[in-house]
UniProtKB/Swiss-Prot annotation:
Pfam families found in the cross-reference section: EPSP_synthase
Family under the similarity heading: Belongs to the EPSP synthase family.
Entry protein name: 3-phosphoshikimate 1-carboxyvinyltransferase
The organism of origin for this protein: Yersinia ruckeri
Pathway: Metabolic intermediate biosynthesis; chorismate biosynthesis; chorismate from D-erythrose 4-phosphate and phosphoenolpyruvate: step 6/7
Subunit structure: Monomer.
Annotated keywords: Amino-acid biosynthesis, Aromatic amino acid biosynthesis, Cytoplasm, Transferase
HAMAP family, per database record: EPSP_synth (MF_00210)
Keyword check for tRNA processing: no
Lineage summary: Bacteria, Pseudomonadati, Pseudomonadota, Gammaproteobacteria, Enterobacterales
Binding, phosphoenolpyruvate: 23, 97, 125, 171, 344, 386, 411
Gene: aroA
Active-site residues, as the UniProt record annotates them: 313
Length: 427
């Protein structure tokens, strides 16, 4: 029997949330700190399942680190070069794409014998495009199904001319970019297809720059990385707040504010998901930006029809915010929802219908027509943290909502429901 949490109707949302560290930034920073020369102190590291999987993998690979008691500060002693193992290893990475993809590429730099595996859902998340790009020099075998983890990696990546499909996940390119400077030869990466989630590549390039490596590119179509380089620790690095996690609180304020301020991201943020606030503003919310905060106040929400490929994770929050808009909302160009923690397009359509919405699910879009009155329902979360957090917004109506398996938020935001309760005035 799955545990469940029933949220009673919320009359008002008001207050400030200090955001946990970004998952995307945390796992990239941990890997680069491990590869770099010198010790790096990471501040505001996210404490969640995905980060623990990366930390456990790095420990197995001989990386020393020291975590503070609350696990948000971490001193990482860099290896000054590739990750290697002197014995055969199996690394279990849960359902953490931000650990699986970058580690798969980084482990191709040395000559080890390492198996990367994870939960059942991880074995359904494609990795073939990354493996194809690496196979010019590296030896990689699929242990179960072609194009999917688990993988056996025995190294041998030297750089050179690579081609990678950019249309499924930007994490494949991120993985190649982070490994390439440590290859013996220069690397030139050509993108096939349309590059999805481009702002996530900007996060990668920003982090690499912080660790002393510059990448040149021609309009995100061809990337050039000099080989034979070493990452250098910046000494200290502050992980900014998670912009995807901010989306739930900002949307809640747009629907039932009051005013909510999220701190840890702002005008200078490296995360593309901060653009979520612009989408809310287009829908009618009132947004204020600071250097390290975003503030949202309630507005009459209008329907919207928009390409949201640039904010794939935060766009899910628009799908549930659409329940409170004046007319039908259409979210387009989101095929990559289908290869995330679950098939998010299918899951979102199924659960939105339960609360009374009329939903059209396309191959790469979703259309949501809000009901006159929301219906109380039990929401399946599909072991997907974002499904649980998105559907908490249903409680901003005059209807309670029951979230099944609420603990799945541990992937990125273990105390999400406590934070939501702290800002809520119940009806």
């Amino acid at each position: 029997m799955l545990e469940s949490l029933t949220l009673q109707p919320i009359a008002l949302i008001n207050g400030t949330v200090n955001l946990p560290g970004s998952k995307s930034v945390s796992n990239r920073a941990l890997l680069l700190a491990a590869l770099a020369e010198g010790t790096t102190r990471l501040h505001n590291l996210l404490d969640s399942d995905d980060i623990r999987h990366m930390l456990n993998a790095l420990k197995s690979l001989g990386v020393n680190y020291r975590l503070s008691a609350d696990r948000t500060q971490c001193d990482v002693d860099g290896l000054g070069g590739p990750l290697v193992a002197d014995k055969t290893l199996e690394l279990f990475l849960g359902n953490a794409g931000t650990a699986m993809r970058p580690l798969a590429a980084a482990l191709c730099l040395g000559y080890s014998d390492i198996v990367l595996t994870g939960e059942e859902r991880m074995k359904e998340r494609p990795i073939g495009h990354l493996v194809d790009a690496l196979e010019g020099g590296a030896q990689i075998d699929y242990l179960e199904q072609e194009n999917y983890p688990p993988l056996r990696i025995r190294g041998g990546f030297r750089g050179g001319e690579l081609t990678v499909d950019g249309s499924v996940s930007s994490q494949f390119l991120t993985a190649l970019l982070m490994a390439a400077p440590l290859a013996t030869q220069d690397t030139h990466i050509r993108i096939q297809g349309d590059l999805v989630s481009r702002p996530y590549i900007d996060i990668t390039l920003h982090l690499m720059r912080s660790f002393g490596v510059e990448v040149t590119h021609q309009n995100y179509q061809v990337f050039h990385i000099q080989g034979g380089q070493t990452y250098h620790s910046p000494g200290e690095y502050l992980v900014e707040g998670d912009a995807s996690s901010a989306s739930y609180f900002l949307a809640a304020a747009a629907i039932k504010g009051g005013t909510v301020r999220v701190t840890g991201i702002g005008k200078k943020s490296v995360q593309g998901d901060t653009k979520f606030a612009d989408v809310l503003e287009k829908m009618g919310a009132i947004i204020h930006w600071g250097d390290d905060y975003i503030e949202c106040s309630r507005g009459e929400l209008r329907d919207i029809d928009m390409d949201m490929n640039h904010i794939p994770d935060a766009a899910m929050t628009i799908a549930t915010a659409a329940l409170f808009a004046k007319g039908p909302t259409i979210i387009r160009n989101i095929y990559n929802w289908r290869v995330k923690e679950t098939d998010r397009l299918s899951a979102m359509a199924t659960e939105l219908r339960k609360v009374g919405a009329e939903v059209e699910e396309g191959q790469d879009y979703i259309r949501v027509v809000p009901p006159a009155h929301l219906i109380a329902a039990e929401i399946g979360t599909y072991n997907d943290h974002r499904m649980a957090m998105c559907f908490s917004l249903v409680a901003l109506s005059d209807t309670p909502v029951t979230i099944l398996d609420p603990k799945c938020t541990a992937k990125t935001f273990p105390d999400y429901f406590e934070q939501l309760a702290r800002l809520s005035v119940l009806a």
